[in-house]
Amino acid sequence: MAPSNLPPVFNATSQDIEMLLAAQCHLGSKNLQVHMEPYLWKTRPDGINVINIGKTWEKIVLAARIIAAIDNPADVAVISARPYGQRAVLKFASHTGATAIAGRFTPGNFTNYITRSFKEPRLIIVTDPRTDAQAIKEASYVNIPVIALCDTDSPTEFVDVAIPTNNKGRHAIGLVWWLLAREVLRLRGTLATRETEWDVVVDLYFYRDPEAEETKEIADESKVPGAEEVGPAAIETGYVGDSWDAAAPGAAAPGSAFAAASATAGATWEAEAGGDWAAESAQPNPETKW
């Protein structure tokens, strides 16, 4: 995918290209900003602008080389006000040592030194130039370079390196941050080559809805296996749940041992009583006054 005048190390693997296409990183919006035209491949009949995925990979490599050139990893600030990118920037920060700002960007973070959250990064990376406009604006005041994930309709003012990609889908955002982190680690020497398997899966960078996860856990807990799932043989032997092994030979149903013990105890009590209870009771004294 790299031009012929660049070394082969810039070439993307077929797996990387397939992942970018599967995550729909090439699908832009219906609007096109004039500065994003060089990254456009074509416009579909339905009006969707398709991004050149080769340009996306070139900009990921360029951005990674800029990040790796900074001596102190903590001087890189990764920012995402969009919920779909907050998990990705936190994971990127934990793997590369950058400083993450997930959620609302406090005005004055880069310009007001009196605030407790004041920072002086050497580079910032934003997920969306539109939602992270405050961070880009303050970075322009203090001459901080900006790398941004830009869609076809994203404003590119004060953006130094634009990575053309779909910045609205959760999978596209997570994959680009994952590829960027992997490329930074490769340049730092943590990973030997791109073909080296990274033990961090891309799913960790994807956004996960907390409410959906709670609903899924509740549904899994309340689910009880039915006869179709367990089988008729287990039902006949007394299977009522998943707390005992129905496949074990001679397995007894839960509660059968307690019922047998209760029956034995009842027989013992009758043997000990052995007589008429009414005959053993003392006759009341007729002269007693109550």
Swiss-Prot record:
GO MF assignments: structural constituent of ribosome
Record text on subunit structure and interactions: Component of the small ribosomal subunit. Mature ribosomes consist of a small (40S) and a large (60S) subunit. The 40S subunit contains about 33 different proteins and 1 molecule of RNA (18S). The 60S subunit contains about 49 different proteins and 3 molecules of RNA (25S, 5.8S and 5S). Interacts with rps21.
Record localization: Cytoplasm
Single GO cellular component term: cytosolic small ribosomal subunit
Protein name, per record: Small ribosomal subunit protein uS2
SUPFAM superfamilies registered for this protein in UniProt: Ribosomal protein S2
Gene3D superfamilies with a match to the protein in the record: Glucose-6-phosphate isomerase like protein, domain 1
Keywords: Cytoplasm, Ribonucleoprotein, Ribosomal protein
Main localization category: cytoplasm
UniProt region (Disordered), positions on chain: 263-290
GO BP, one annotated term: translation
Keyword Ribonucleoprotein assigned: yes
Function: Required for the assembly and/or stability of the 40S ribosomal subunit. Required for the processing of the 20S rRNA-precursor to mature 18S rRNA in a late step of the maturation of 40S ribosomal subunits.
InterPro entries named in the record: Ribosomal_uS2, Ribosomal_uS2_C, Ribosomal_uS2_CS, Ribosomal_uS2_euk, Ribosomal_uS2_euk/arc, Ribosomal_uS2_flav_dom_sf
Species of origin: Talaromyces stipitatus (strain ATCC 10500 / CBS 375.48 / QM 6759 / NRRL 1006)
Similarity comment: family membership: Belongs to the universal ribosomal protein uS2 family.
Bias-annotated ranges (Low complexity): 263-282
Keyword Ribosomal protein found: yes
